[in-house]
Amino acid sequence: MTTQRHYSPIDRLLLQADMAMRTLLPFSGQPYRPSPAIVQPEAQMSDEDTRHVAGLMRINHTGEVCAQALYQGQALTAKLPQVRQAMEHAAEEEIDHLAWCEQRIRQLGSHPSVLNPLFYGLSFGIGAAAGLISDKVSLGFVAATEDQVCKHLNEHLEQLPAEDEKSRAILEQMRIDEEHHAETALEAGGFRFPAPVKFGMSLLAKVMTKSTYRI
């Protein structure tokens, strides 16, 4: 029989600060699972392809920064304990993606986006606001966000050079995990967002992808 842990508001604030540092500081996010890229050979790519892949992986890394902040914000304001636990568990799984993307970016001779703190703060606020409205809306936001992430992953998989098996292995596993997160959120009672809301979310996502591809 497992014992549910109860945290005071100060405890939760300290946990949020710890998670923020683990998300934003270089090399601080330690994955729970080894990177799928480990077993893949390093490809010989042109400088142009290497820069392009680094840009794609930088976008994906920032996407995971946003996911971390979103889940943490929702966990802070979630009303039901089981929803809070689901948000915290999803955030732990996203740590893997965060670390895998950063590892790959470094292997490609590049760096994460300097805009990550900005996007973390914005996403944390959105997540906390969604949690304040209702757990149903909060879970629905997770599902809609993960759907958007999967679309980006599919686009990036199509753009990867055929020989880059390392990046491909990472993105394919990320897609599997994100699809599972979306399904779990809906099964837990998440609200299915209408198309206009999803369209607005896609416009915001474009701002992130365009800005973080290079910086």
Curated annotation (Swiss-Prot):
Chain sites annotated for binding Fe cation 1: 64, 94, 97, 178
CDD domains registered for this protein in UniProt: DMQH
This protein's GO CC annotations: plasma membrane
Highest taxon of source: Bacteria
InterPro entries associated with the record: COQ7_proteobact (IPR047809), Ferritin-like (IPR012347), Ferritin-like_SF (IPR009078), Ubq_synth_Coq7 (IPR011566)
UniProt KW keywords: Cell membrane, Iron, Membrane, Metal-binding, Monooxygenase, Oxidoreductase, Ubiquinone biosynthesis
EC identifiers of the protein: 1.14.99.60
Chief place of localization: membrane
Pfam families: COQ7
Catalytically driven reaction(s): a 5-methoxy-2-methyl-3-(all-trans-polyprenyl)benzene-1,4-diol + AH2 + O2 = a 3-demethylubiquinol + A + H2O
One annotated GO molecular function: metal ion binding
Pathway involvement of the protein, from the record: Cofactor biosynthesis; ubiquinone biosynthesis
Mode of membrane association: Peripheral membrane protein
Subcellular location: Cell membrane
Any one GO BP annotation for this protein: ubiquinone biosynthetic process
CC cofactor: Fe cation
Function summary: Catalyzes the hydroxylation of 2-nonaprenyl-3-methyl-6-methoxy-1,4-benzoquinol during ubiquinone biosynthesis.
Family: Belongs to the COQ7 family.
Protein name in the entry: 3-demethoxyubiquinol 3-hydroxylase
Organism: Pseudomonas fluorescens (strain ATCC BAA-477 / NRRL B-23932 / Pf-5)
